[in-house]
Amino acid sequence: RDTDRSRGLGDVYKRQNYHKRNKRYIHEAMRFDLLKEDPYKGERFSRGKHAIRKYLTAEELKKVKDAQIDSETICRVRDLFVFQAYTGIAYADLAKFDFKHELQKRGDKYVILDARVKTDENYFIVLLSPAMEILRKYDFVLPKITNQQYNLRLKIVADYAGFDRNLTVHMARHTFATMCLNNGVKMENVSKMLGHTNVRTTQQYAKAVSYTHLRAHETDQYL
């Protein structure tokens, strides 16, 4: 089961981190002549497989969008998450971008052209109808929230949506990536939209269920 697999991968990463920390301490001890040789010398440890990317299915995203939320604060958090799920924009880039003044228009679509905060890599996003609806709702000035508060309040959004698992900021971005790839958007174009420095990073999103909310040509024709 996915849960068992995720738990197994988690154990692998815990072991990797444990040995990584140990090696650091050992090398420091050797530097001060407190230890004569490295006990790890000659040892090889499995790096394990990439963790499975967590994303929402079409049905799950619809539950988030349609959830009846009686708190304005939590409603704003839900809107931010849905906006990210339809754009793939990273949290730091979302917080930085001035949607009121920096959006560009190409044909009948609005687009984001910017450089990522994390890597300074250029990215390009075509804003689809659900994302535009949210922007117009807030008059192109999206709510501001810290990353920590965002993740905390997403747990409440998950409760409203009836999920037995948490939502996270990164899950929105992963949802966008899988929805694009499963609707035929070219890998290199998804990579451009996400601002990945290497297309291999994008390939990690390739295992996902079919999505019905996005037509590939809506983005491909602009790239």
Where are these regions (language model features)?
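Basic, Lys/Arg- and aromatic-enriched nucleic-acid-binding interface segment
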Residues: 18, 35-91, 95
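C-terminal flanking helix
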Residues: 23-26, 30, 210
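Catalytic-site neighborhood detector that most strongly recognizes the C-terminal catalytic loop/helix
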Residues: 116-120, 194-215
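Short basic/aromatic active-site micro-motif
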Residues: 17, 76-77, 164-184
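A Lys/Arg-rich helix-loop hairpin that forms a DNA/phosphate-binding surface
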Residues: 1, 7, 143, 169
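C-terminal catalytic core of tyrosine-transesterase DNA break-rejoin enzymes
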Residues: 82, 86, 93, 173-197, ...
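Single conserved hydrophobic/aromatic residue that forms the stacking wall/gate
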Residues: 2-13, 213, 220-223
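C-terminal catalytic core of Y-nucleophile DNA break-rejoin enzymes
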Residues: 116-156
